Each structure stands twice: as C-alpha cells, then as structure tokens.
C-alpha cells in the first residue's frame, strides 16, 4: 500500500478520534488547524467521510459532526469483549471503593492495550485514553500479563518489546524474570514511576478472559496516595475479582431473537 494511502487512512481515523475528544460541531478550518492538516487534505477527507455516511455537514453553519453510523461501528464490541458484564461490574465496584482510575488491560502482540477505563474522581490524577498501547515491559499490567506465559515466551516478548522501546527504557531479561517471579508468588503486580513518573499501579488477574486472552484489572494514581492505601486498594481489587467469577454455563452470551 502506498504511503499516501496509509496517511489518508490514519487521518480519517484521527478525525473521528478528534470528534470523540471535542464532542461538538467543528468547521473545516478548525479541524485542519487542530490536527495540523493542509486544508486541501482536510477538505477531501471530510467530503469522503460525508459520502460514506460517517459525518454530517450543516451547510448553513458550515460545520461537521459525526453520525450514528460511527457509533454503530463499535456498539457491538463491549458485549463481545465483556460478555455478561461481570468485568464491567468489577471495574465499577473498584472505582466506587477507591475513587482511583480503573482500567482493564490485555496483551496486543508485544504491547499492553487499555481496552476499558474509568476516570479517577480525585483532584490529583492521571488521564488515560482507552485504546492506548505501550510495551508490555513498561507497566505493571504488562508484567502481570507476562507472568501468565511460559519463561520461553517471556524471553521472546521481552526481546521484541525492547526493539520497540527507546534505549533508555529497555529492560534486561534477568530483571524482568525477577519481577515476574515476585508477581507469581504474590498474585498481584505493583509498579511505581512507570509508565508515569509519580504514579503507581496495582493490578490483579481477572478470572474471565477477554476474547480468550488473560486480562488485568488495575487501578492507577498518585504514588503517595497508593502507598497510604495499599492494603485497602488491594482488598478492593481482590473482592471485585471474586465477584467477577463466571460459572462455566454463563461463559457465552445467549442472543434471543423474537
């Protein structure tokens, strides 16, 4: 595929992500300026998205806004990922008990991906966008997911993740294996100052998988607050995990059509 086609595809998705952030109508000039696109490219992309039914154009005000077709692209995904809803309930339970940012993470090749997040209610907090990825070696959730693999697979992933990581953030295999041994012994992962300086994360494995993959239920926030509340936060995570255990007969959602 030509690089120009790749760039156009990326920009089309960036426009949709842009509307997710601003959540209001925008003119072509505002979109082009905010995303640093040439106006000619923005015009073509917007017209294409209109023709495909993903954007509405108000000719009187000369502004654009997404259509429900954008929502339809992914409205089926949460049910496929989270099944009967126990995972989402577990997230809400932890959020209610701690007020901290909560997320579910899964492996995506050599990366950790945050597939669902709930924002912290504390004044001092860190923001995390759903869909964000980072190398598995660069977060407590990633370490926890690595701990579910054989040592040979961990070796392979660490080497590949290091290739995708800046030199100053690469990890030595023996250091990673020591971390993973501790995680396997304790049954949970804790990380401080990684990936965010001054932040701390606490993670446990969910009993249910997401699309057949192990999933981590985590909370993250200011390190000092986490150190002061470590036991309470860990208890909240473990209680949520116990509540998320799903009987075998309920693993697969049943669709009933009338």
Predicted regions and their residues:
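Amphipathic alpha-helical regulatory segments at dimerization interfaces
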Residues: 34, 45, 86-97, 103, ...
């Amino acid at each position: 595929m030509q690089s120009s086609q790749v760039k156009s595809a990326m920009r089309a998705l960036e426009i949709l992500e842009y509307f997710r952030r601003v959540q209001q109508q925008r003119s072509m000039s505002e979109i082009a300026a905010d995303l640093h696109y040439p106006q000619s490219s923005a015009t073509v992309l917007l017209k294409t998205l209109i023709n495909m039914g993903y954007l509405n154009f108000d000719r009187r005000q000369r502004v654009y806004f997404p259509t429900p077709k954008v929502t339809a692209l992914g409205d089926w995904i949460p049910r496929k990922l989270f099944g009967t809803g126990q995972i989402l309930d577990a997230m809400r339970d932890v959020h209610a008990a701690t007020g901290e940012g909560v997320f579910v993470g899964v492996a995506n090749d050599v990366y950790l991906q945050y597939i669902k997040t709930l924002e912290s209610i504390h004044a001092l907090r860190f923001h995390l966008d759903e869909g964000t990825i980072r190398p598995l070696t660069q977060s407590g959730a990633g370490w926890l997911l690595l701990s579910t693999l054989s040592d040979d697979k961990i070796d392979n992933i660490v080497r590949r993740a290091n290739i995708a990581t800046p030199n100053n953030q690469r990890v030595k295999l023996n250091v990673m294996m020591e971390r993973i041994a501790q995680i396997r012994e304790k049954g949970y992962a804790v990380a401080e100052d990684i990936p965010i300086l001054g932040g701390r994360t606490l993670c446990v494995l969910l009993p249910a998988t997401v699309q057949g993959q192990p999933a981590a239920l985590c909370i993250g926030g200011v390190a000092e607050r986490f150190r002061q509340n470590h036991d309470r936060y860990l208890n909240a995570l473990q209680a949520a995990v116990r509540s998320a255990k799903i009987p075998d007969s309920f693993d697969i959602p049943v669709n009933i059509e009338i």
